[in-house]
Amino acid sequence: MAPSRRDLQLTPVTGGSSSQISDMEEVGLLDSYHNEANADDILTKIEEGRDVSGLRKIQVGVTGMTCAACSNSVEAALMNVNGVFKASVALLQNRADVVFDPNLVKEEDIKEAIEDAGFEAEILAEEQTQATLVGQFTIGGMTCAACVNSVEGILRDLPGVKRAVVALSTSLGEVEYDPNVINKDDIVNAIEDAGFEGSLVQSNQQDKLVLRVDGILNELDAQVLEGILTRLNGVRQFRLDRISGELEVVFDPEVVSSRSLVDGIEEDGFGKFKLRVMSPYERLSSKDTGEASNMFRRFISSLVLSIPLFFIQVICPHIALFDALLVWRCGPFMMGDWLKWALVSVIQFVIGKRFYVAAWRALRNGSTNMDVLVALGTSASYFYSVGALLYGAVTGFWSPTYFDASAMLITFVLLGKYLESLAKGKTSDAMKKLVQLTPATAILLTEGKGGKLVGEREIDALLIQPGDTLKVHPGAKIPADGVVVWGSSYVNESMVTGESVPVSKEVDSPVIGGTINMHGALHMKATKVGSDAVLSQIISLVETAQMSKAPIQKFADYVASIFVPVVITLALFTLVGWSIGGAVGAYPDEWLPENGTHFVFSLMFSISVVVIACPCALGLATPTAVMVATGVGATNGVLIKGGDALEKAHKVKYVIFDKTGTLTQGKATVTTTKVFSEMDRGEFLTLVASAEASSEHPLAKAIVAYARHFHFFDESTEDGETNNKDLQNSGWLLDTSDFSALPGKGIQCLVNEKMILVGNRKLMSENAINIPDHVEKFVEDLEESGKTGVIVAYNGKLVGVMGIADPLKREAALVVEGLLRMGVRPIMVTGDNWRTARAVAKEVGIEDVRAEVMPAGKADVIRSLQKDGSTVAMVGDGINDSPALAAADVGMAIGAGTDVAIEAADYVLMRNNLEDVITAIDLSRKTLTRIRLNYVFAMAYNVVSIPIAAGVFFPVLRVQLPPWAAGACMALSSVSVVCSSLLLRRYKKPRLTTVLKITTE
């Protein structure tokens, strides 16, 4: 089934206590860094006794943002609305999140606030956990970090909104909100009130379906379809767009399923209507394409009108006939002046209307953005030219006009924005490739009585339900996560796990949606669909990272907040400085243009300063790089959960490894068994296996597998494990009771009403079990050879010892050496005994070892290393590693590990390969280097270009930068930054053969 855009890491919002508010802030993986202050505000309100449980949160698409100043503008506009508690804006995603009190402010008011700020807004989507929904919205018009901050600020302060994140790179906003307090329309309105375009992309509501309907040819067809929907049981409400054929249906899932709903519509329409479930990515892609197309149309329109201006200004004066026509006086002006005025007016106020609208809304909201600079620069050129014409008509003194500067400036800015939209689209290529892994359709097998297959039909993959039996042809993609029920084949899982070798699949083998069936036909039963599917969760993690803000983004946000006022101030100084210089004779009149004045000469410098300055490049420097890097990481099997984690990893000083399952393969095998009692070997193994059958620890599974093989000479499963449930039902194991797993020690339970202990020395000591010297010597010999000695005591007496070996991963030693070459110090922290730990550490080349450490103690080790400000990474795979993963600055969970470990980590290594630890750190370093280069370019561009535009070098070079050329430079600067980030797509992960060439950075 096609993946959802959401992960399942959100918790319900119940409100009422500070702890609850704190929890919901902590689990919000998409929260940007400035959520903290808002959380404090809410906590303060709780302490004051004010109820915040009724707050609502909306997510809106904001159109019109072009730079960081825009997002700051939208955010400020929303924060100024009474009743808005929190707002956040993502510039690249054109998205805003708002938290507000519906008793004080309505969604329409928030939308109007964004529109009043000069942007268009539209509700995007909503998602439901238990008490909240999460909606995703497109936000059009964002161009820089200021736009993002503005939209985010508005959305976060909306009552009922729990979390809001807006991303510039994808023009998306995500809002988690209480649907009882605020709805999606209110969120869209908030975005539009901020001056951006917003629309709903998708919802995680289980009772909502968006369909594309083919077959609506006229009004009668639409009425027939509406009649069918009205009669269908379970349909609560629907909305049909008769022009686009898009149908949105809200239904009761307890009455009718989504597939039954689609089947019912098609059957009642007697085949006239064909319905297809619309993927949220499809809807989003169409919006992105539409925005780029709209920008292209604007550019072409402006270009078509600018070309005649160029001919009138440059070519025609050299052609006698045309020159005569242009200087022919028609009323108070010459024909050429009339033509230029008319053409430029269309460009200025029709094609360039968007700049005025966005600038006005931003200014009205007390903020500034790139649109303000463009509107100011073009208006100065246009209205000066109009004034010069009117002044000439009245006085007879004709000054030069600069209509062409205004027109060409708008044309070049539109070209730059079009190129920028294309470049930004490239940053999401990795996400698009992940989405395309899911097939559009699936073959559903229908069953008759007794489970006999009676037929098959093709259905939309988005309509697959858990329990469906599906047929997968050779070469086809697996349509959903599930289990093979018939057939055998090899499946290529490289696109999901990064593992290049095809994996054998037989009956009861799990399969992952989006992977490719290589050879034989398979029948599978779907188990996980929608947001539960592996591919969906991968996409959700990538999307989460792309929506988040890296801490380094704070710099761009600060600069964006002061950028435009500083530029306007510099432009005024330029105008005044050159004007005064001319008045006092500081420069010769020969510098002036023909028929020009000192004011005109100064004005051109001032306009160039205004239009050459570019806040967009700064706003795009970080989010575009983060977006590309997270996508590249996903394609290489490294899932990064956020910009914060991506940034922290570049300065990792220590990497802490767990031993079992991390440095080792996690495929423990029993190599030695020695009985120190009157029991025979079979009795002993049955006793130990019975005790360990209830444990999920790798060592326990190894013991059970060994005992089974001893009794039945059976082969274990492919991964060295056996099915404990089957073992318990097989009859050869003894009944147990009072089972307890003791982390860091072992297990204990009752067998035949007698206590059995299986574990290490600590467990024996705590239970007063004496270990004779000859047994201790035997255990020490095992440990010194790198094996784990498991001691067994029964009914108060030691009865035997088992030696278990867990082979090291083949790449472990090389990865450790690679980390040392990178300037990173590896440390092994394990709950195993010191002798085994030292033996394993020596084999892989780790000098710093911490053994016999309890799970909570691992977190203490990390905190001790963090005391001097060092950045610590933790690599683990088990539940007992989750406290350490959470305590580390950068937690890395092995993908084959437990869900708890993956949940606590910042990175997920899908391949279960330690080589990806180096990839994660190396990718982080490359990304931060690229971000710094982007900032250097963006800052250097403004630092160098503004003085040039102001004429600082004019006395030496005698070259004045025309306003249109300044506008072209400005437009191309942001495109250059995006293209710089796109270079990260060429990233190649370090290979085992080259990893040792990595040097310290």
Swiss-Prot record:
Cu(+) 2 binds at C144, C147. Residues 11-21 have a biased composition (Polar residues). It is found in: Membrane. GO terms for biological process: ethylene-activated signaling pathway; regulation of stomatal movement; response to ethylene. Mg(2+) binds at D877, D881. It comes from the Eukaryota. The active site is at D658. Residues 56-122, 133-199, 207-273 form the HMA domain. Cu(+) 1 binds at C67, C70. PROSITE patterns: ATPASE_E1_E2, HMA_1, HMA_2. It catalyses: Cu(+)(in) + ATP + H2O = Cu(+)(out) + ADP + phosphate + H(+). Its main location: membrane. Belongs to the cation transport ATPase (P-type) (TC 3.A.3) family. Type IB subfamily. This is Copper-transporting ATPase RAN1. It comes from Arabidopsis thaliana.
